[in-house]
């Protein structure tokens, strides 16, 4: 994938009900690698997969998406194989799976480790003791995140 594909990648996310926008896809291009299937649709890519390595010890496979009209044609399997090969030598490769993708991942050797849920809350009022983050806070935030996540991801965090 190249930068000119960003709008069609964002369209793929939207079409399959995910929430990534072009800025999110830019992170994958900058910090990792993205492979897509372009079937000529001028508005939307057919399929995608991305990898985000965090050094040699940890990597995440992301954005394994297939447009509805192109499903059950082996695209997800092909893209997942590319991602796994791209990350060869990485100690731990992980991903999070939707119910639709779980079968594909299981066939390639991935197994369940934990679940997740997406939560949202309305904006809350700021109360005493809470302040915006300052530049001086970064070292402590990065140390805490690295300890909790298991790898450094400064570039990703600074994007938010």
Q: Model regions: which residues?
A:
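Short loop/turn motifs at secondary-structure junctions and domain boundaries
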Residues: 25-31, 159-160
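Conserved beta-strand in the GNAT
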Residues: 36, 43-53, 57-65
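Amide-forming acyltransferase catalytic core, primarily the GNAT-like/NAT-type
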Residues: 110-160
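Helix-loop element at the rim of GNAT/NAT acetyltransferase active sites that forms part
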Residues: 3-6, 11-23, 144-155
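Conserved acetyl-CoA-binding loop-helix of GNAT-fold acetyltransferases
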Residues: 63-66, 72-85, 103-107
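Conserved GNAT acetyl-CoA-binding A-motif
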Residues: 59, 80, 86-99
């Amino acid at each position: 994938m190249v930068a000119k594909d960003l709008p069609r990648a964002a369209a793929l996310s939207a079409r399959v009900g995910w929430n990534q926008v072009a800025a999110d896809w830019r992170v994958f291009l900058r910090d990792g690698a993205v492979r897509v299937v372009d079937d000529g649709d001028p508005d939307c890519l057919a399929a995608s997969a991305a990898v985000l390595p965090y050094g040699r010890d940890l990597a995440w496979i992301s954005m394994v998406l297939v447009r509805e009209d192109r499903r059950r044609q082996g695209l997800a399997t092909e893209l997942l194989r590319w991602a796994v090969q791209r990350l060869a030598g990485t100690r731990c490769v992980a991903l999070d799976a939707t119910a639709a993708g779980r079968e594909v991942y299981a066939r390639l050797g991935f197994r369940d480790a934990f679940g997740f849920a997406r939560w949202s809350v309305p904006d809350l009022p700021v109360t005493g003791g809470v302040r915006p983050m300052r530049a001086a806070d970064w070292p402590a935030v990065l140390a805490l995140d690295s300890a909790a996540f298991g790898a450094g991801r400064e570039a990703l965090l600074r994007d938010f």
